[in-house]
Each structure stands twice: as C-alpha cells, then as structure tokens.
Amino acid sequence: MYFNKMIPELSVTNLENSLKFYQTIGFKIEYERPENKFAFLSLGEIQFMLQEISKDDKWKISPLLYPFGNGINFQLEVENVDKIYSFLKDHNCKIAFEIEENWYRQDEKLLGNKEFLVQDPDGYLLRFSEDLGCK
C-alpha cells in the first residue's frame, strides 16, 4: 500500500459513528486496529487516519472542544462533486457551505473548482471539490 507524504490523523469522539459517515460517502477502510480504536481510510488518493479519543491520549495537548479542527478545512478533490453533495443532502448531513463554483487566481490564470463544505460527526470541515479546469 502506498502512503501519502502527509496523512491527517483526526481525533474522533466515536470511531464507529465516524466510520459510518466516511464509509457512507465512499471511503474504504484500508486497515484497522480495533484494540486502539484506530482506522486508516482512503478515497482514491485521499487518505485519513481516525483515532478515537482516550483519556490517556499522548497527542492531546489541550481539551478538545466541538467543533474539532476549528480553523481548518480539508480540500478533497473528487470526480463527481454533485453526486456526493446530493447524497449528503439526502442523508441530512450538516452542509456548512452550499455547492458553488469558485475561480482562484494563480498568477495569470484562473483555476476553477465546484465545491462545498460539510461537517463530519466531530465538526471537521471537509471541502469536496471538483476540478473545472483553468481559464
């Protein structure tokens, strides 16, 4: 298995709930360590690690308050953003920003994305994005 050079590990309050959410939107469990309440997930080239919070968590440097990941969002490039968006809306997931087209300047060209933001069960923001090319 190939591991990306950067793989976010998200602290979650309930691994089972988080796995249901991520699997529902297409993530695959690559491997698990049930004894540690840990799972490694992938969706295409996107990789995440999930670890259920424990009271003796050595990685926790301050109390975790909902929503987790405050101040950050993860951009996940997918091939069909409309399909994921519709599915999440149909399942009453908390959409933070509705789907829209955005064009971002890179030097002299504009790069397009069709994107939206959704919160996972612990409040992490996931920005699903589809490449619209450049102009």
Task: Report the location of each language-model feature.
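Vicinal oxygen chelate
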Residues: 1-7, 28-79, 85-119, 129-135
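Catalytic core of Fe(II)/2-oxoglutarate
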Residues: 11
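Acidic active-site catalytic centers that drive phospho-/nucleotidyl reactions
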Residues: 14, 80, 120-122
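Amphipathic alpha-helical segments
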Residues: 14-28
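Conserved active-site tyrosine of GNAT-family acetyltransferases
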Residues: 18-22, 88, 123
